[in-house]
């Protein structure tokens, strides 16, 4: 998650993939192979663990086989672009869900609408992922891995500060109050801080701040992803609360310059009272650490999450569409979702399986799974250039809102809209 959030611009991708031409196909493939088939699959390192578990389980129980190649996250988009330009894509490839619309519009994925329609649980697939994998009413991808933003709180620090360790924040205002209490009661020696965030990381801001906007009933863009609403309430209300936390020194001192790689590293050390975190980090926390998990809320309540992670599709140049679909559809099955994903405390791609024999052992996991149906994944054709790029306009706006001159927000918001419309 941390490397994904740092993000890279995808201008080069669009230039390279323009050589591919054509649409996403109609669900057919070239001459299919007879007998057992070995298909190729690419994924980025950020989702290596989940991908390897799925492939291992499939290969051990099927005649067809999947050959998985894991590519360094920072090299993944250029690698996909180069392969697309040379018409040498693998049979199956996963992608950061945020960038799926770009791949789909370039014709890199096969149209699998009819195949998805035949799934008995087609209406139970992670809605945000399915939305971004749909173009002009046709569907091209399935959810692969999911990573959600939630609030973690350290129960031991809460108890030491005189807070109820079993009651995390239900509103962003409560979040701020509890973080401030932690800072006031425990932060005098500089080893403990109320909260933390990635203050110099565009992807970190969208992942952790935007859910508060959605929870309050607002939006950060129009539905087409071409107009920014980040200079309006409730976004400005969210910025104000976080700015007050920073001004009161209730935030770890390195937050202002945190570019993403280490923003989740302070909480597991027991140094932070309460903060937004990726759901995937829950299983990585120290075993003896008492952690509460609660949905991200708006200033006065509500709940939402940023539904991140990767979607997966069949390449439009595959010669093994049927074999590829056999694998992809299996990854959505009860067996794969429960015995592979849930068993390892991963977030499930199907909302009807959110409570299962493994997740029920940990109420926090049940809660995280339940948010898949409530969260959002923002759509914008130029998301990477605008929001993830460290030189993009979003990071400038967010930093002025928190650390600088908030009166500049209308001007900087216009720059975001300009970038979205280029």
PLM features per residue range, with description:
Residues 140-144, 149, 173-227:
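Extracytoplasmic/periplasmic solute-binding protein
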Residues 178-180, 224-255:
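Glycine-centered hinge/linker elements that transmit conformational signals in sensory
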Residues 98-149, 290-294, 357-363:
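Hinge/lid segment of periplasmic solute-binding proteins
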Residues 159-160, 165, 247, 375-422:
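Conserved C-terminal helix/tail region of periplasmic/extracytoplasmic solute-binding proteins
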Residues 279-288, 299-396:
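C-terminal lobe and pocket-closing loops
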Residues 83, 90-91, 121-157, 302-303, ...:
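A structural signal for short loop-to-beta-strand junctions that line the ligand-binding cleft
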Residues 2-102, 117-121, 165, 270, ...:
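Conserved N-terminal structural module of periplasmic/extracytoplasmic solute-binding proteins
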Residues 70-79, 98, 170-174, 254-268:
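Short helix-initiation/N-cap motifs at beta->coil->alpha
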